[in-house]
Design a protein with these regions (language model features):
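Short catalytic micro-motifs in class I SAM-dependent methyltransferases
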Residues: 125-126
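A conserved beta-strand element that flanks and buttresses the S-adenosyl-L-methionine
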Residues: 122
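Conserved class I S-adenosyl-L-methionine
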Residues: 1-45
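Class I SAM-dependent methyltransferase SAM/SAH-binding core
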Residues: 51, 59-108
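Conserved glycine-rich SAM-binding loop
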Residues: 56
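A short glycine-rich, Lys/Arg-flanked "PGG" loop and its adjoining helix->strand segment in the class I
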Residues: 135-146
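Short conserved loop adjoining the S-adenosyl-L-methionine
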Residues: 108-115
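C-terminal alpha-helical "lid/dimerization" subdomain adjacent to the S-adenosyl-L-methionine
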Residues: 151-206
Length: 214
């Protein structure tokens, strides 16, 4: 068995703007990791208001803003330093007026409720970091419009990477990532009207949750 292992990532602790900027630069260089997410997002063809949960330095939000100028985004990020760097990044791209950065925790129900309703709520590579994913997903579902959609894109735990004895952030994330059956167990307690969980090649997990069946 290769049980889920929760390990602290050194990269998750951003001590100051310098560390946040370094992380942001690395994220910019590895845009290919978001390719599958952006392709699926395009196929969903959702207009209106988006909420990016765990927005980091705004790489994904900025890319979406450039491709979909009519979409209004709220970027929720736990780290104040990362959010500050994100604002710089968005200004450089010229999309700062399209995106509102908010510092806070997705597990904070009061904060999330204060953000309003969204046509799409998404997260990229954040699910495996949430201490209480059921609570976060439940809270996010309440912020969807009647036909809104929650899209979670993350790594998937696979045996052929799990056993590699590396302490890099990527391999720690692989060991801490969920598999399809575990996500199903999380969602069972929430009773969404519709959901789909897909294993994506080579080690990704795509989760779509609809508040209302269309």
């Amino acid at each position: 068995m290769f049980k889920r292992k929760i390990e602290i990532h050194h990269e998750e602790v951003f001590e100051g703007l310098g560390a946040a900027r370094q992380y942001a630069e690395e994220a910019q260089k590895s845009k290919m990791r978001y390719k599958a997410f952006l392709e699926r997002l395009k196929s969903l063809d959702i207009k209106g208001r988006y909420l990016d949960v765990g927005a980091g330095s705004g790489v994904v939000a900025g890319t979406i803003a450039q491709h979909y100028p009519d979409v209004q985004l709220t970027a929720l990020e736990l780290s104040a330093d990362m959010a500050a760097v994100g604002k710089e990044h968005l200004k450089d791209k010229g999309v700062q007026d399209q995106i509102n950065f908010v510092v806070g925790d997705a597990a904070d129900e009061e904060l999330v409720h204060s953000l309003g309703k969204f046509d799409l709520i998404y997260s990229t590579y954040a699910l495996h970091h949430w201490k209480n994913p059921r609570k976060v997903i439940d809270t996010l579902m309440t912020r969807l419009t009647d036909k809104g959609l929650l899209f979670l894109h993350d790594l998937r735990r696979v045996w052929w990477l799990y056993w590699i004895p590396s302490q890099s952030g990527f391999f720690k994330s692989i060991r801490g990532a969920y598999i399809r059956a575990e996500v199903q167990d999380i969602l069972k307690g929430l009773n969404p009207e519709y959901y789909e969980i897909k294993n994506e090649f080579p080690f990704l997990l795509s989760i779509i949750i609809r508040k209302q069946t269309i």
